């Protein structure tokens, strides 16, 4: 199947409604049903629970708790490298950021200004830099770690369409 045909349903389905429904289900305390769902997910995507601080699947009350599980100490030692990824995953795209350059993320084009919530001055500070798009598969650990000290000074909500993340759209 071509990439266009694989992505087409994402334009036709009610993305916000489906995302809200998935969020409610992921946060639901379903007892044995939640445990069965997590167990099936671990098996299907070959999730390495030995890396988790708590490898007991039955101890996660919600799918969100499982999905954002902490790692055990020492599971991700920092490499002595010039570049360290803050997440598990694979680099799906990498390139230079130039004035008004638009680059791909999730199969769609964005400008740096759009990616920082419409702040043109902030977007311009990235000109001359580089970007990397990191694809996290379902089996990947989904927390972000910074290999350096820092302080979060502000957060910006960036509205937009919600698209499935998979190798076709990554």
Set out the residue ranges of the language-model regions.
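Non-catalytic terminal segments and appended small domains
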Residues: 1-170
